[in-house]
Amino acid sequence: MNLLRTFNATLARRPLATQVIVSGAVCGAGDAFTQYLTGQKSWDYKRTARFTCLAAVFIAPPLNVWFRVLERVRHSNRHAQVFSRMSIDQFMFSPFFNAIILVNLRLLEGFSFSKSVDKMKNDWYDVYTSSLRLWPAVQLINFYFVPLNYRVILIQVVAFFWNSWLSFKTQTPALEDPTIE
């Protein structure tokens, strides 16, 4: 219980820093887990570092701000408020956010900006439509039950599995399209 109390106190004092650290750790663990499950001969620590950096720099800080923006969405009816937040998140923010994540992942891999955009275009539709099978339900739970400072952390706990899939999806060579390197 002391560890949980310390975590809660740290989150209350430094929400962004705590969210960044937890997000990076969970995302990196998701990639390492994927490498283990797919039977890679050796651990690609650089790949795990890229996923850790992706979450810590390009995911947690924007989500921290985004959830505070969504807090401003108000309705007199609690159900309408939660549904509005989820809808805005999934249909206005998520399409762009997924694209930004995919481009940044490729930039971290060392691809040029134009090649990163090409790769994003190749992966985006599948990633976004797959995200719609998971994240609306998660966000409904998030907006109904989870205090604001914990929302990024809940997202990253669920994202352990999502990031495992995303790592698999983006790190497996595309056999059907020889133009994508």
From Swiss-Prot:
Tell me, which GO biological process terms does this entry list? regulation of mitochondrial DNA metabolic process
Function, as annotated, reads: Involved in mitochondria homeostasis.
Keyword terms, alphabetized: Membrane, Mitochondrion, Mitochondrion inner membrane, Transmembrane, Transmembrane helix
The record's subcellular location field reads: Mitochondrion inner membrane
Where are its TM segments located?
20-38, 48-70, 91-113, 140-162
Classification via PANTHER family:
PEROXISOMAL MEMBRANE PROTEIN 2, PXMP2 MPV17 (PTHR11266), PROTEIN MPV17 (PTHR11266:SF17)
The record gives the membrane topology as: Multi-pass membrane protein
Q: Name one GO cellular component term.
A: cytoplasm
Organism equals Caenorhabditis briggsae
Tell me its family: Belongs to the peroxisomal membrane protein PXMP2/4 family.
Primary residence: mitochondrion
Recorded protein name is Mitochondrial inner membrane protein Mpv17
